[in-house]
């Protein structure tokens, strides 16, 4: 993993810790800065601090960090992400107020913001999800593959014992696990449906390449809907479910 991605992943853990316990979060961010900011400051660290401040309604401090992150980000893409967040917080708006969820690109960035807010999700799941969303405009099929991975990783994190039982019995498949969770009434029919939709879309994105010649890459990319709001909404349904389930059942993540 590149240093930049390692910083991003670790900053999400520190973000979660601060959101839930500022003392632990301050310590985690201090350690992260000691490790990576000896020569220069890093935009992703300060963006994650800003999100943690915003989660705890410390909006002036959040805005200051978002502005610093924008200055520190080395590429236009991330500067635009920071500016969008600056605009939203400056107007004292939540993601629900700011984004038009009927517009696919807005829905992408709404989802991005919600992942930062869903601090009861597994840290690595949040990282993979944010990474997939950040490149979704140009690599949507790969994002679908990542969303399937997000689903599987979070199921393994939240329902570890059930997954281990299926692995031990050599009967593991994501479809089997989803059906088992529904049979045990751990998830509703609607959640199970959303999970199966993401599972199948990820499978399709993985295997559809086989339908095209090696030199026919453009046709592969073009074979996917560029305005796939349905799958984004399925993903949001799943992420919200797990965030709420983990919070309500006091499922602990490592400090």
What does each of the following model-derived ranges do?
Residues 8, 44, 78-81:
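Start-of-helix register in tetratricopeptide repeats
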Residues 25-28, 62, 143:
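Single-residue signature of alpha-solenoid repeat helices
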Residues 189-255:
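Charge-enriched, short contiguous segments at helix-coil
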Residues 75, 80-141, 244:
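Charged alpha-helical initiation segments
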Residues 20-22, 56, 93, 137:
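Structural motif corresponding to the intra-repeat A-B loop/turn of tetratricopeptide repeats
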Residues 17-31:
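Helix-turn-helix repeat elements of alpha-solenoid scaffolds
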